[in-house]
Structures are given as structure tokens and as C-alpha cells.
Amino acid sequence: MNITIPFNHPPIVGTELAYIQQAMASGKLSGDGAFSRLCEQWLEKQTGCQKVLLTPSCTAALEMAAILLDIQAGDEVIMPSYTFVSTANAFVLRGARVVFVDIRSDTMNIDETKIEAAITPKTKAIVVVHYAGVACEMDSIMALADRHRLWVVEDAAQAVMAYYKGRALGSIGHLGCYSFHETKNYTAGGEGGALCINVPNWIERAEIVREKGTNRQQFFRGYADKYRWQELGSSFLLSEIQAAYLYAQLSVAEQINRRRLVVWQRYSQALRPLAERGVAEFCEIPTACQPNGHLFYLKLADESVRSALIRHLAECGILAVFHYVPLHSSPAGKSFGRFVGEDRFTTVESERLLRLPLFFNQTDEQVERVIGAVKEFFLS
């Protein structure tokens, strides 16, 4: 079986090598160099975040968030089960218990109306996941967190350049985490991430945590005569080579964003009749949300139809894939967490969701081939 249209192809804009060569010539490769500063400044301007720090991955950003929130053994952290394992791992590593709640069927995001019932005296934080770059209902979640004096972390791995009521995702919670993995809209050469710090008096501490728990940044700025181990931390810097690759992409981020939205809209327009016939459902975009075209999915009647469509597309040379297996159904999810309330949508919706190819360098001809193959399946 020859796959000629991959599910994903890392974005390439053409200036990456030139920027990497500049970074190599600078003699500064280990991070926090000129390209790191350019990326962080771009993200701060784009999002309005108080401070953005590049990290080796979104996983690392989430782990930094758990340290900054001083997560301790026995604390509870509320999140959706329909997410990537890093969302939970970051907090479990600090000793927390994960409390899963159900998702909304329209957006696949955490159901904001189910959170309050999961809050206990041990609850420390709420982690929201903006699935497919579509925002969670942030106003009600932030109001709930404020009433109960809880922290909110945005897992915005898929949500760079996506907005909620005009506010950049990642800038609304107390902390926000981005991914620049090769599957995301913008990549730092395969792996990468960023932590958005929206509480000003956490910025200095975040720099310490990021530098292995030392005040190295203060030393470089001349605020300390030597740097010392201050507290718990780890090596959370992105290399300057990767920052150079990322800056090439951020420099044309609007172009990448526009192209992905064009592909997303073409899928939506061409496949809308399937929804009208009742054989498939699409992601619904709430009016408060401005998405970024991160991914396009169909929801089929059930898992067997999804499997049949995957096989049909593969026979047409097209790779389409499903997504997360809910964490609460996994061995580690059962060991380190619990599901509160009814699992009305998490499992059943995850079993019928299928993602179609969508990437920046995808040609119009490839898009039309995918559309044609999907339509053919439902006509057969």
C-alpha cells in the first residue's frame, strides 16, 4: 500500500537553513541567544502574555507549570481524559492525583459545567485543553477558578494563533503551554514548546526553574555575583539551533495560518453534505472562538465505520488517523487518577473521530483527492 498523501508533513517555509547557519556562526548554541529572544518577543507581542519562555517541548512547559504551581503529593488536578498523556504526566510526576471529567461533544473540549462537581478540598488546579485549536469556555472556567481559588493552566499545544473572544489562547489562564512539535502549525525543527507566564510575580521564579533551579539569568544580567542553586528545577531551555528554525516559521506565521484555514474551510465546504445526510459530523466552532486550522476531523457513526474509512483512504494512498485513547481507560490513568461523573461523551466520541490530512505544504490537488476519496467511501 503506497501512501502518497501523508497525514502530516512538517511545515517548511524556505528560510530555516539560512537562520540555522546564522545561529551556528554566532557561537551561541545552547539557548537564550538572539533567536530565542526573537521568538519569545514575537510570541509576547502576538499573544499579549506577560512573559514567554521557550522550552524543549510542550511536555517540558507543562512540567514547569506543575513546579511553579508547587504541586505536591496528594494535590488534585482536574482535566479532561481526552488529551495527550503529557497533560497528566506533568502533574503526576509531582505526586498529584488526576481527576478526569467529561468533554463536550461539539468541541471535544472539557465540559465546563462538569468541573465544579469534581472540586474537593484537595483540588489545586484546573488544566484545560484547547482541542484542535478551538477554545474551551474560558470565561466561565476562569470565574469558577476564581471562586474556588484555583489555578488554571491552558494546554494550548494545538492553539498557537487561535483566540477566544479576541484573546490569544495561552494568555487567559495563569499559565499557558504551547507545542512546536513537527505535527503542529509551527515547528522548532521537530520538537519545541513555550511556557506563557501570565502572573507577573512568577516570571523571575520561572526563569530559575527553567535554569535547573539556579539564578543563572540574574547572574548574566549582573544582578548576582555568582549563580547558585535556588530551588527545584530542570533543564528546560530550547537550543538556539531549534529557535532559529522556529523563528523562520514565526516570521511567516500569518501565511501559514491563512493556508491552513483555507484547507480547513475547503474540507468543511466540500464535505458539508455528509453532515446534512447524517453520515458524518464535523467540529462545531462556537461563535466566541477563532480557530487556527490545526486539524480537521470527521465523526463517524461508530468505530467500525471509522476503521472502514481508514482502510478505504489507505487504499487510495491517503493516511488518515484517529486520535487520543482516553487516559482514564489506560493502566496509568486508572493508577494515578479517577473519572468523576458520567463518561457520556469522552469514550464514545473518541472512538468515532477521524482526522484528515492537513498541513501547510499540502497542495490543492492533494486536498481534492482527500475530498474525493471520502465522498467515494460514502457512495459505495
Predicted region positions:
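Nucleotide-sugar donor-binding loop of glycosyltransferases
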Residues: 75, 81-83, 102-104, 156, ...
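PLP-dependent aminotransferase class I/II
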Residues: 37-41, 46-52, 113, 117, ...
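Helix C-cap/helix->beta junction micro-motif
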Residues: 94, 147-148, 316
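Active-site phosphate-binding strand-loop segment of PLP-dependent enzymes
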Residues: 106-188, 194-201, 355
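Conserved PLP-anchoring active-site segment centered on the Schiff-base-forming lysine
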Residues: 63-119, 125-127, 312
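N-terminal "arm"/small-domain region of PLP-dependent enzymes with the aminotransferase-like
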Residues: 1-30, 228-230, 357
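Phosphate-binding glycine-rich loop
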Residues: 29-76, 90-94, 100-102, 167
